[in-house]
Swiss-Prot record:
GO CC annotation terms, alphabetical: cytosolic large ribosomal subunit
Name the UniProt record assigns to this protein: Large ribosomal subunit protein uL16
Cross-referenced HAMAP family: Ribosomal_uL16 (MF_01342)
Keyword terms of this UniProt record: Ribonucleoprotein, Ribosomal protein, RNA-binding, rRNA-binding, tRNA-binding
Domain of life (superkingdom): Bacteria
Subunit description: Part of the 50S ribosomal subunit.
């Protein structure tokens, strides 16, 4: 699982999800990529699940890059707890994804297999996304 080693503050505010991604919108390392088309919080478990789906499909022939990192804690209060008494404890870590952001990159010699692997990964993510190549822009 992807989690930060050390953070300055254990709990954070939740910002509104607005705007489009200003950086990380092109494929830099691989040949193909998954690009987000909407706002979302992607959890560390969803990132790991998508990575496993890609690796199982391509087996040993290619290389995968993960371009997002879950650096924001989301908190939750325990079940059957009365209101008040402060903010809940951190439950999971999420990455704040904006439209246009490239989430995963893949380098693989066969385009058909690469697209099939990335399609499987998209099904594991909670957002609408598309597959792009190195030449495409947002």
């Amino acid at each position: 699982m992807l989690i930060p080693r050390k953070v300055k503050h254990r709990k954070q505010h939740h910002p509104r999800q607005r705007g489009i991604a200003s950086g990380g919108t092109t494929v830099n390392f691989g040949d193909y990529g998954i690009q987000a088309l909407e706002h979302a919080y992607v959890t560390n478990r969803q990132i790991e699940s998508a990575r496993i789906a890609i690796n199982r499909h391509i087996k040993r022939g290619g290389k995968v890059w993960i371009n997002i990192f879950p650096d924001r804690p989301l908190t939750k209060k325990p079940a059957e707890t009365r209101m008040g008494s402060g903010k809940g404890s951190p439950e999971w870590w999420v990455a704040n994804v904006k439209p246009g952001r490239v989430l995963f990159e893949l380098s693989y010699p066969n385009e058909g297999v690469a697209r099939a692997a990335l399609t499987r990964a998209i099904h594991k993510l909670p957002i609408k996304a598309r597959i792009i190549t190195r030449e495409e822009q947002f």
